[in-house]
């Protein structure tokens, strides 16, 4: 991505934040998280081969990527007061220590 792409992306995110309520954005995030959980479950089923899905591995991976991007988009549109980088850093450090 170049600087122009980031500027356009930021403008689109601002548009969503101004025109879609916080409640609606949180509802969207919860729906996307549920779809992500289903996509991860199908991916795990395919990896384990215990209860495989009829979809191909490529389809499953593409679906997982799409759900990840849906969540990322929702997170990009979360209100600034919900973002706390101290918590982020603490969680990241804990993960590294494991």
Please provide the spans of the model-predicted regions.
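Flexible "arm" and connector segments at domain edges
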Residues: 1-98
